[in-house]
C-alpha cells in the first residue's frame, strides 16, 4: 500500500565566500566557507510505501535512479535505521546540475529530514547530519538548517548571522565537475582567516573571494564572460565549484532591474536570502 504524497522544499545555497585552507592526507581539501540558503530550489514529494521499496517516479535524464541522491539518501536511512517502510519519490528539479548551488545535496537532505518524520524514526539532527556526510560534504549544512560558517571539508558547522539580501544568480549553461576543479587547484599559499576575519569580510562584497573561481574561469570561457558582464553592476562571485555566479543586492528592485537587462542574454533568477532552512523545525 502507498500512502498520500507530501511536498517538501529543497532550497539552493550560495557560498558567500570560499577559501581553500589546506589539504588532508587523503586528498580532500580543507575549506572555510559561508553557506547561505535562498528561496529558490527543488521540490520533493514523498509517499510512504508499506512494501519497503524505494521508487523514484521522476528520474533525471542521464542519472540512473540508483545513483540519484534522493534514492541513495532514502536507502541509506532505511538501511541504517532498520526501517521496513519504503517511499515513492517525485522530484521537481529547478536547480541546475553542476552549478554550485547544492541541488543534489539539498534534495538528499530534504529526503532524510522528511523520511525521518514520515517513517517515525525520530533521529536527532546531529545523527542525520552524520548520515548525510556519507552522501556528500554539502549535505550536512542543509540538515543543520541555518546559514553557516563551515570548516573542515565543509562539515564542521557553526551558525553565522547574515544581513537581509537579494541575489541575482546567472547560470552560464556549462556543467562543472567539482572533482575536476579541485584536481586542478594548485594554489600553494593556504591560510585560515577565522570567524572574526570572515565577519569583517562579509560586511561588504568587495573583499569576498572564491579560491576555486580562477580555476573555473580558465577552463570555462562562458563563466569568465558572465563574471565580466556582472562586474558592470557590482562585485560578482562564483558559488561553490561553479558554474553559477551571483551578485548581492540590498533590495529585490535592484536585483530585478539588473536581471531585466541580463535576462535578454543569460539564464538565471532572482532569489531572496533566507535566515533558516524552510524545514528547520522538522528536525530536532
Curated annotation (Swiss-Prot):
State the NCBIfam families in the record.
ispE
Which reaction is the catalytic activity of this chain? 4-CDP-2-C-methyl-D-erythritol + ATP = 4-CDP-2-C-methyl-D-erythritol 2-phosphate + ADP + H(+)
Q: Which Pfam families match?
A: GHMP_kinases_C, GHMP_kinases_N
EC number, as in UniProt: 2.7.1.148
| The keyword ATP-binding is assigned to this record | yes
- Segments crossing the lipid bilayer: none
Residues annotated as binding ATP are 96-106
What broad class of enzyme is this?
transferase
Question: Which residues participate directly in catalysis?
Answer: 13, 138
Q: What does this protein do?
A: Catalyzes the phosphorylation of the position 2 hydroxy group of 4-diphosphocytidyl-2C-methyl-D-erythritol.
The record, for InterPro entries, names: GHMP_kinase_C_dom, GHMP_kinase_C_sf, GHMP_kinase_N_dom, IspE, Ribosomal_Su5_D2-typ_SF, Ribsml_uS5_D2-typ_fold_subgr
Name the record gives this protein = 4-diphosphocytidyl-2-C-methyl-D-erythritol kinase
Q: Which UniProt keywords apply?
A: ATP-binding, Isoprene biosynthesis, Kinase, Nucleotide-binding, Transferase
The family this protein is said to belong to: Belongs to the GHMP kinase family. IspE subfamily.
Amino acid at each position: 500500500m502507498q500512502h498520500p504524497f507530501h511536498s517538501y522544499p529543497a532550497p539552493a545555497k550560495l557560498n558567500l565566500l570560499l577559501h581553500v585552507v589546506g589539504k588532508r592526507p587523503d586528498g580532500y581539501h580543507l575549506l572555510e566557507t559561508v553557506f547561505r540558503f535562498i528561496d529558490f530550489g527543488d521540490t520533493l514529494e514523498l509517499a510512504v510505501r508499506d512494501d519497503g521499496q524505494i521508487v523514484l517516479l521522476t528520474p533525471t535524464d542521464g542519472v540512473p535512479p540508483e545513483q540519484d541522491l534522493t534514492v541513495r539518501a532514502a536507502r541509506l536511512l532505511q538501511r541504517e535505521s532498520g526501517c521496513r517502510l519504503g517511499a515513492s519519490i517525485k522530484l521537481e528539479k529547478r536547480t541546475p546540475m553542476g552549478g554550485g548551488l547544492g541541488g543534489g545535496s539539498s534534495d538528499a537532505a530534504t529526503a532524510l529530514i522528511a523520511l525521518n518524520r514520515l517513517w517515525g524514526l525520530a533521529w536527532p539532527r546531529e545523527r542525520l547530519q552524520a548520515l548525510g556526510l556519507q552522501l556528500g560534504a554539502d549535505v550536512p549544512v542543509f540538515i543543520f538548517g541555518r546559514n553557516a560558517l563551515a570548516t573542515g571539508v565543509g562539515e564542521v558547522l557553526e551558525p553565522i548571522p547574515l544581513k537581509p539580501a537579494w541575489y541575482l544568480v546567472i547560470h552560464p549553461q556549462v556543467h562543472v565537475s567539482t572533482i575536476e576543479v579541485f584536481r586542478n587547484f594548485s594554489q600553494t599559499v593556504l591560510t585560515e582567516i577565522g570567524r572574526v576575519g570572515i565577519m569583517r569580510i562579509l560586511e561588504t562584497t568587495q573583499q569576498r573571494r572564491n579560491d576555486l573561481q580562477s580555476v573555473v574561469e580558465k577552463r570555462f570561457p562562458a563563466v569568465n564572460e558572465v563574471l565580466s558582464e556582472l562586474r558592470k553592476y557590482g562585485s560578482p562571485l562564483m558559488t561553490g565549484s561553479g558554474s553559477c555566479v551571483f551578485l548581492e543586492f540590498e533590495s529585490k528592485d535592484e536585483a530585478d532591474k539588473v536581471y531585466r537587462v541580463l535576462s535578454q542574454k543569460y539564464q538565471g533568477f532572482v532569489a531572496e536570502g533566507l535566515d533558516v532552512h524552510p524545514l528547520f523545525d522538522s528536525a530536532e
